[in-house]
């Protein structure tokens, strides 16, 4: 029995198809090095675009923060000056009242407490400078490092300001305390 012509035709068609497929696969496949290079380029482009967008957003946030910090600093400086000036007026009025004859014997007891409250008021006035809106920590996680950097800078600046403010006033308070103490005991 001879094999039918249909079977032989099918076999030849399948063989031809296989040959075509192998040729197509060989043409489509790129070398591994080129594929890796292209993938890297695609990833780099996408990463660069994302990073540039993030940088723009961070710059915007940073600018807004700077403006808000400046406004807050101005307001807080004026407020702290008012508190300190008000405190000095009240402090000196108390001292003048205590120098009057009926209250002079209470001066030694009251003066140290007034002295300590003066420092607490002053520290409170200095601590009123928050500089950083806390809700930014919740809103922008990318901005946390930037905010921490700003916070550290502000803390350094605040320490310098506090040292500059407290030292001369400490000296004045001590002088007043010594003079009044001597004055009361001499009398």
Swiss-Prot record:
Q: What is its main location?
A: cytoplasm
Q: Where does the record say this protein resides?
A: Cytoplasm; Nucleus membrane
- Provide one Gene Ontology biological process annotation: meiotic cell cycle
From the record, give the transmembrane residue ranges: 83-105, 163-183
According to the record, the residues making up region (Disordered) are: 1-24
Please provide, in alphabetical order, the Gene Ontology terms of the cellular component aspect for this entry.
cytoplasm; nuclear membrane
In the bilayer, the protein is annotated as:
Multi-pass membrane protein
* Signal peptide as annotated in the record: none
Q: Which keywords appear in this protein's UniProt record, sorted alphabetically?
A: Cytoplasm, Meiosis, Membrane, Nucleus, Transmembrane, Transmembrane helix
Q: What does this gene product do?
A: Has a role in meiosis.
The identity of this protein, by name, is: Meiotically up-regulated gene 155 protein
Lineage of the native species? Eukaryota, Fungi, Dikarya, Ascomycota, Taphrinomycotina
């Amino acid at each position: 029995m001879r094999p039918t012509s249909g079977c032989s035709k099918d076999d030849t068609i399948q063989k031809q198809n296989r040959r075509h497929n192998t040729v197509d696969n060989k043409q489509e496949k790129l070398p591994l090095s080129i594929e890796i290079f292209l993938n890297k380029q695609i990833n780099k482009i996408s990463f660069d675009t994302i990073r540039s967008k993030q940088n723009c957003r961070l710059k915007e946030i940073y600018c807004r923060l700077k403006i808000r910090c400046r406004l807050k600093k101005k307001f807080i400086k004026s407020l702290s000056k008012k508190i300190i000036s008000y405190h000095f007026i009240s402090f000196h009025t108390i001292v003048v009242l205590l120098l009057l004859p009926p209250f002079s014997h209470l001066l030694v007891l009251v003066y140290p407490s007034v002295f300590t409250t003066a420092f607490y008021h002053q520290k409170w006035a200095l601590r009123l400078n928050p500089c950083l809106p806390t809700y930014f920590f919740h809103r922008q996680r990318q901005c946390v490092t930037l905010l921490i950097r700003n916070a550290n800078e502000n803390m350094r600046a605040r320490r310098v300001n506090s040292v500059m403010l407290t030292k001369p006033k400490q000296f004045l308070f001590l002088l007043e305390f010594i003079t009044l103490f001597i004055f009361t005991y001499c009398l």
